Amino acid sequence: MSKRYKQLTEKIDVTKAYSVDEASLLVKNLVSAKFDETVEVAFNLNVDPRHADQMIRGAIVLPHGTGKTVRVAVFAKGAKADEAKAAGADIVGTDDLVQQIKDGIFNFDIVVAAPDCMGLVGQIGRILGPKGMMPNPKTGTVTPDVATAVKNVKGGQVNFRVDKKGNIHAGIGKASFNADKISENLITFVKAINRHKPSSAKGRYIKNCALSLTMSPAIKLDVMQLADMK
């Protein structure tokens, strides 16, 4: 453990489960890097993703965005292509965009597709899938309303998906955000997780949750408080 990391650890009471407001204030005191660190949240859920009805996946637009500039590629044609461009899409195409991806050029972070272009997107599913870029209706990235999808993604939409161990990780802001913005983004994200609770899930749904910065130790959150956020 480095001296810097040890000093940060000493600021956290490891025996305590912090409220959202307390954690949002404390995480501001853990800034140590020379860059604008990402505020990260990690959940451990009491679900078994091997069961289809317990595969937690979705998207949420955070009220204050993520602080990250997101580049969006859109598969659309005709009027839908024009709408995507007007909404601020960085790249809009069809066959040309397929070829670009086949050539290994990824000058974008997220892919959105109109439903009538999913046949094209299917040609490159094996490329996009492993990169986590495959458009999906559950995250709002396959939709006839491509303009809204682009605005949501640009405006701070966070996609989330539980891993095989029941964990969800996401960036919900930057260290430069004030504590209120961090708190409001976190509450919005927690509510989204709670809305996705499977009816078949037994016992405590959110088993553990922690808030941290890119280079900081984790702050344990009070899961009883989180459970009441609907």
Swiss-Prot record:
Alphabetically ordered keywords of this record: Repressor, Ribonucleoprotein, Ribosomal protein, RNA-binding, rRNA-binding, Translation regulation, tRNA-binding
Function noted in UniProt: Binds directly to 23S rRNA. The L1 stalk is quite mobile in the ribosome, and is involved in E site tRNA release.
UniProt KW Phosphoprotein keyword: no
Protein name: Large ribosomal subunit protein uL1
CDD domains xrefs: Ribosomal_L1
Family: Belongs to the universal ribosomal protein uL1 family.
Keyword Nuclease: no
Gene: rplA
Assembly and oligomerization: Part of the 50S ribosomal subunit.
